[in-house]
Amino acid sequence: MKRKMLKRLLTSAFACMFIANGLITTTVRAVGPKTGEENQVLVPNLNPTPENLEVVGDGFKITSSINLVGEEEADENAVNALREFLTANNIEINSENDPNSTTLIIGEVDDDIPELDEALNGTTAENLKEEGYALVSNDGKIAIEGKDGDGTFYGVQTFKQLVKESNIPEVNITDYPTVSARGIVEGFYGTPWTHQDRLDQIKFYGENKLNTYIYAPKDDPYHREKWREPYPESEMQRMQELINASAENKVDFVFGISPGIDIRFDGDAGEEDFNHLITKAESLYDMGVRSFAIYWDDIQDKSAAKHAQVLNRFNEEFVKAKGDVKPLITVPTEYDTGAMVSNGQPRAYTRIFAETVDPSIEVMWTGPGVVTNEIPLSDAQLISGIYNRNMAVWWNYPVTDYFKGKLALGPMHGLDKGLNQYVDFFTVNPMEHAELSKISIHTAADYSWNMDNYDYDKAWNRAIDMLYGDLAEDMKVFANHSTRMDNKTWAKSGREDAPELRAKMDELWNKLSSKEDASALIEELYGEFARMEEACNNLKANLPEVALEECSRQLDELITLAQGDKASLDMIVAQLNEDTEAYESAKEIAQNKLNTALSSFAVISEKVAQSFIQEALSFDLTLINPRTVKITASSEETSGENAPASFASDGDMNTFWHSKWSSPAHEGPHHLTLELDNVYEINKVKYAPRQDSKNGRITGYKVSVSLDGENFTEVKTGTLEDNAAIKFIEFDSVDAKYVRLDVTDSVSDQANGRGKFATAAEVNVHGKLKENAEVTGSVSLEALEEVQVGENLEVGVGIDELVNAEAFAYDFTLNYDENAFEYVEAISDDGVFVNAKKIEDGKVRVLVSSLTGEPLPAKEVLAKVVLRAEAKAEGSNLSVTNSSVGDGEGLVHEIAGTEKTVNIIEGTSPEIVVNPVRDFKASEINKKNVTVTWTEPETTEGLEGYILYKDGKKVAEIGKDETSYTFKKLNRHTIYNFKIAAKYSNGEVSSKESLTLRTAR
């Protein structure tokens, strides 16, 4: 189409567009009557995100009455939704055309409405997928064209979201769904939704372009236990209201029935039960239902062939016979990959069912597990291949029937954005809390409509902004702590709770363990905890009653935890100030708040706000930083689950070490050995049991210590209580570099399993660095024994061994014969920073420090000093002197140096002929990047690499083995000049080859 409005946008002095917080700001004009007054209006957040949206003008204000064209031809439900919106916004419809009024034209592709084609100005929904639409607002006119009636209805929903206080930006939208069926399966166990909940939900689905509502409540007896019986008259009236509301909102009302609990398959009884199915379906069909589902989930019977045969017969005798019924939907008895597949092959039930069930029937599946973290593309490909069709997803989030104390308030998360290759039907199972389920459902609408552009974080923020208005920021604080569902056994799903806050907490513990200044971070956390309490109190005071009823207990829980978190910070500050009285007072408050939280039905922020209190209660400034401890075990489980020994000293209570239980199992004796980074005076070992299971919990122990890792001395034996609480094993102070915990007894969740296994979430040591412990170490020096005159010699400097100190910096002086060598440069090794300076002829001082803030490793080469051989010499001496190490306490320790001899011999260097590169060209050009390629120069003797230039400026030097390079972060549709030159070892650079081109539009 012609982009005359885009041209105007680019050339007008008044046009201004920028992106901020997901909103597009444009300068807007009032239309019809021109007043010359300009206002700012926002192209607001739209849900779902449109496939294509272009701002094509300045925008305008809709007049108080409009001309409506096409209402007689357009989809009735779309027109009704439009009229309802106009009435709610006090916009009247003119009885006769008024040229000074805004004009809105509405219709479908196959309607004969000339005004619609004119207003669309070449944009059309004709070539879009089903349910697609085009929307153009321009020059005081608004045009909405649907590919079909559903598309027109969805165009109206987008129009409703665009209009704010009668202002509408000038936009050009073409939009269509990624997935054909998008919606909800009301399939949770527990308190069913009320009738009003369902009506409200159905309207919400239509507004967010969700087109499927599967009615399958587990607690509706006529869906499951009484599936043979017809609904009573009172229930039929209720069902009719739901069916009608669904039709009005372009939602397929899918009636689900679960006969598997006691259906009979064979003989007269089987025929009777099949007829019950038909009769039940007929009654719903007569009420307007055109979509049906027969479920075999959560039953004991695994008669795969019979299940499929019932479906096939129903499909032939009812679905296809009717002619206007959508494809039948089913859930097999095995409905997750773990149940369906073994060693990459389908299990017997799944194989038989897949081979038998008719290809036209939609088969639902929940992903790798019943409730799971993700659906990777490989998993969808596997199941789609087994069933030889696109699958239908029943995603068990935000459902909470397996963990009722917690609310699932997060976005769709862990779903591959290419899932539509194998899935064309996507539904989510909501919570029994209908109102709060809308947050996740809102993001599900975005994911399933525009999968490729889905961003879970943006979708989540947008959902809360659109649903909660002035309370949105408070709701984000609350919901951020309630996104992760984890019942600590078989079910885990959703984005982690408050990940940014958890990272700050972890940073605090690291700083405290490393004796770093944490005052700024502590103040920041005080602010976070105060904001949590404030947000929850605001929500309690201002949330609508229907939402507050669903979350009041969790709001109280987060308030309690926030207060406990603040008390936990008070404990830490008191420890730092050595104020015992303040510490004990804060500890009592923190413990009481934790006890209150743990005794509550409500659950929230278990690994963040709750865990922080637990961590603070067990924190001790004498704790030796777990991340500096090397830990080994008698055995570790890394096959059956990820539970290595290192997890027992990672500072994370949610990971754990487990002795090897997969075949061949290691059934004892069990022990853990901790190697400390220095010699410490220790007096306490902390044992934190695994939190999610008692299996392997240590109840008997022996603690031994050693200075050399070979000769151990026992310091304490005893027993521990059989519970999940953190335990401390205290003893008289003793010097130790190694600590071993031997397991003398442990519990099991298996009969006769006592002592077989051992586990630990954390095993930590408390103590203080041994005063006056001698720090020793030795320097390493690496270099070739022979070098030719004129060549460079790389001299590697590092540390062979360091004892009783953590190194954060090294200081070396490299000595060389100034008559034989000339200093060239110093080169950093990975993860370190090197600063080198020639302090006098024959001496280079080399400073090495950590780039990451972590201790430097003991490595033979930490830095390389490059010397150029200038004259022949036999046995020229290289030495490292004045060597020292800076530790984590800011102390400096001297360490022993070393030396080495090198022979410098005469050499005959081959003649170097400098030539330019050949065949310099662009192999790929797009909007932001250009990739160039070339052939090496005709002569390569002495070739060291290549220098690349952009618009006359050097941008990169690369090695001689490279023959391509990508210039990145370019501007679109812009002319650039690229050049390349070859660099040789004699210091010469070839002539430059040049390339001029324009990036893509």
Swiss-Prot record:
Residues 916-1001 form the Fibronectin type-III domain. It comes from the Bacteria. One of its GO terms (biological process) is polysaccharide catabolic process. PROSITE patterns: FN3, GH84. Residues 515-543, 573-597 form a coiled coil. Keywords: Coiled coil, Glycosidase, Hydrolase, Signal. A protein binds at residues 187, 218, 297, 335, 394-396, 401, 429. Changing residue 390 to A: No change in activity for 4MU-NAG. It catalyses: 3-O-(N-acetyl-beta-D-glucosaminyl)-L-seryl-[protein] + H2O = N-acetyl-D-glucosamine + L-seryl-[protein]; 3-O-(N-acetyl-beta-D-glucosaminyl)-L-threonyl-[protein] + H2O = L-threonyl-[protein] + N-acetyl-D-glucosamine. It is an enzyme of class 3 (hydrolase). Its EC number is 3.2.1.169. Residues 180-452 form the GH84 domain. Residues 1-30 form the signal peptide. GO terms for molecular function: [protein]-3-O-(N-acetyl-D-glucosaminyl)-L-serine/L-threonine O-N-acetyl-alpha-D-glucosaminase activity; beta-N-acetylglucosaminidase activity; carbohydrate binding. InterPro entries: CBM2/CBM3_carb-bd_dom_sf, Cohesin_dom, FA58C, FN3_dom, FN3_sf, Galactose-bd-like_sf, Glycoside_hydrolase_SF, Glycosyl_Hydrolase_84. Residues 179-469 are annotated as: Catalytic domain. Inhibited by O-(2-acetamido-2-deoxy-D-glucopyranosylidene)amino-N-phenyl-carbamate (PUGNAc) and streptozotocin. Belongs to the glycosyl hydrolase 84 family. This is O-GlcNAcase NagJ. The lineage of its organism: Bacteria, Bacillati, Bacillota, Clostridia, Eubacteriales. The gene is nagJ.
